[in-house]
Amino acid sequence: SCFASLLTPQGKFLYEFMVVKHKSGYLIDCEKTQVDGLFKQLSIYKLRSKVEILDLSNEFVVAVLSRNKFLSLKNTQDIEGNTIKFREDTLFLDPRNKKLGARLVINLEKLYLSIKKLNLKPAEPKKYYSLSHKLGIPQIECKHLKDKIFGIECNFEELNGIDFKKGCYVGQENTARIKLKNKLSKRLFPINIIKGELKEGEIIYHNENEIGKVLIEKDYPFALIKYRDKNFIKNTDFNT
């Protein structure tokens, strides 16, 4: 299983998702709010290819297991993307960061039985999303990144989402140029609110110097930060 994305011809972010082998085809695991847009985008790329693209979001769900639970099962390896079959369904260690645990992509009708077989206990989703935020991996409201940020600025290289040895793909020219010429000066970072509120698009300052912009404001906020700017200092407070 792998982490992947769709970019604009300019290399800007469109959609991110995980690709999982399932029987004679593949399943795409993405944020629920992005299903319709991603489905339409993939249908455009289909052209005359003998490929059938289906929206199965009402039939399949994703359950998240801890990394330790995954490694307690037979034939597992502590490697991002490591994939096994569990009762005919796909179970894989998150390809972005193994600290996020494993994902079970399963038909909704079989979910309860699999939870019972795995002896899983329910956990607060907030704990999972808080961990993801801490690790710098946005999973909610990613639509606010669309066309606003380069894929490489989303830390896709660190999240195993870019292969610089791969052949041509949409958005490759700018992505490769930024990488090879060491032009990456901004990155997506998680931010924590000390006081007040954030709004999408707000400029972030340090000592009256602009160093970034808020892109995701709700629940688990993220900002595009000029991390190479001389005014950017780690472990300090900023204001908007």
PLM segments and residue spans:
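Glycine-rich, small/acidic residue-mixed loop/short-helix segments
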Residues: F13, I152-I162, Q172, A176-T240
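Anionic-ligand-binding alpha/beta catalytic cores of soluble enzymes and soluble regulatory domains
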Residues: L100-L188
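Glycine-centered loop/turn motifs
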Residues: S1, Q77-I84, E197-E202, N235-T236
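Acidic, proline/glycine-enriched N-terminal capping motif
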Residues: S1-E16, V20-K23
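Residue-level recognition of well-ordered beta-strand positions that form the cores
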Residues: M18, D29, V105, G167, ...
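Acidic, low-complexity central loop/insert segments
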Residues: M18-L135, Y205-H206
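A generic beta-sheet turn/junction motif
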Residues: Q10, K21-K23, K46, L184, ...
